[in-house]
Amino acid sequence: MRRPLAFLLALALLLPQGTTAAASAMPEAPNCPIYPSNDVWHSSIQNLPVHPSSATWIANMGGASRLLHPDFGGPYGYQLQITTNATPTTRVQFDYADESDDVPYPFTAGTPIEPASDAHAFMLNKDTCLLYELFAASWNGGRPTAGSGAVFDLKRHDLRPAGWTSADAAGLPIWPGVLRYDEVASGFVDHAIRFTAQRTDRSYVWPARHQAGAARDASLPPMGARFRLRNDFNVAGYSAQTRVVLTAMQRYGLILADNGSNFFFQGQVDSRWSDQLISELKRIPAGAFEAVDASSLMIDPNSGLARGANGVPLEAGWHSRWLSQSDYLVMSPGQVADFWIKFTNTGTETWNRGIWGRQANLGLNGDDKAPYRLGMAAEWLWDDRIATTTVPLVGPGEIAEFRFKVRAPMTRGTFRLNLRPVIDGTVWMEDQGVFWLIVVP
C-alpha cells in the first residue's frame, strides 16, 4: 500500500507540531478564537441527561409541531464589522448604563446596524480579539446611543457580572451563537447556536447572567437553557450543508438567549446561503428537540470554562488517554483477525473524521513501516496509519473506538505493533507505550 497523492500534497501543508486552530475562528480574524475550545459554547451536550421539564418547556414554546425558523438568508441576518486598533472609537450613551460597559466602542457611521427593531450592532477588533455588541444602536448624527452595550474578550472565559444584561436578554454574547456561512461550508460547526422563545421564566441558568421573563413560572424555560436535536433524528435525507447544521444541533445544541419568536435562530448575512438549506431547516419540528441538564459542565458559576463530557478533566489542545483494547492473539501465518482499541479524548478539541488536521488516526509510533513490509496491513488507511475513529465526531471527554484488521506475517515469531493516536497535519498525541503482540508459533 502506498500513500495517495492527495496525502503527499497535504503533507507539504502540515502545521508545525503542536499548532491548533482557533476555535470557530473566522477567515477575517484568523487569530481570534470565538472563545477557547474548552468554553461552554463549544461543549458537547449530546450525552447529557434530558431535563425533567423538557416536554413542558417545549409545550410552552409553541408545542411539538412548531417549526424551526432560520432567521437569516439573502439580505437578512446579523453583520459583523471587523475593526483594528486604528479604527476610530467613540463613547456611547446607554439607556441601561448601570449594566453596560462604559468604554470607547469602535462604532462608526459605517457600522452595520440590524434593520429590525432590536437594532443590534457587532464589532470585532481583530488586533485585540475584543467583541463589542450593542442593542438598540443608533449613530444619531455622531452622538451615538444604545439601549445597552457589552464587551467580551474572546480569548477568555469571562462572563458578565451576575444580573447584568448585554446586547441580549440573557447577558450572553450574541456573535458566538450566530451561524456563519464559512463554518457551514467547511463542514464543521463547533458551537451552540443562539435562539429565542416568546415567553421565558424570570430566572436564568449558567452561563446566562440575566433574565427578562414574562412571569415567575417554572413551566417556562429560563434564559441559558440548552436544547439539542435528539440523537435519533435521522439527518441522512438532508443536503450536505443542512446536515452540518443539524449535526451541530445534536452535539452542541441551542442556547436560549433572548425573548422573541419561538425557535427562531440567527445567522450571518451572506448571499451564499442556499434556498435549499433555509427551506430544509424550516421543516424541522420543535418536537425533534429536547432540553438537557447542562449543570454538570459548570466548574465556576462566574466562568464559561467547562468540563468535558463525562466529567473528564481536559487539557488545552489535542490529547488522548488509553482506555482499553482487545486481547493479544496467537495467529496462523497469513491469518487475518479483527482488533479494537479505545482512547478517551482528554483535550479540548473535537476529533472530526474526514477533515484534515482534525481527524484522529491510529498510527504506528514513529511512522514505523516494518509491519507493513511484513505484510501485516489489512485494509489499513496507509502503510503506517492503521485506522480512524468509528464515529464521525469525538468531543472532549468522549470515548473513541478504532477498529481494524491485522494479517499475521508468514514467518514465525512474536511481532509488536507500537500504537499512538495522531492528528495528521497537526500533532502526535501522547506516547503511552501502547502496543499489540501478534504471536505466530
Residues covered by each model-derived region:
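Short, surface-exposed polybasic-aromatic patches that bind anionic ligands, especially phosphate groups
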Residues: S24-P313
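Short, solvent-exposed loop/turn segments enriched in Ser/Thr/Gly
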Residues: P333-W340, G413-L417
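Bacterial N-terminal signal peptides
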Residues: F7-Q17
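Short, surface-exposed loop/turn segments at beta-strand-coil junctions that are enriched for proline
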Residues: K405-G413
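Low-complexity, acidic Ser/Thr/Pro/Gly-rich terminal tails and inter-domain linkers that flank the onset
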Residues: N310-S332
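Short acidic, flexible loop segments centered on an aromatic residue
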Residues: T346-W382, R420-I423
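Short proline/glycine- and polar residue-rich coil/turn motifs
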Residues: T390-I399, V439-V440
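Enriched for extracellular/lumenal, surface-exposed ectodomains of secreted and cell-surface proteins
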Residues: T390, R420-V427
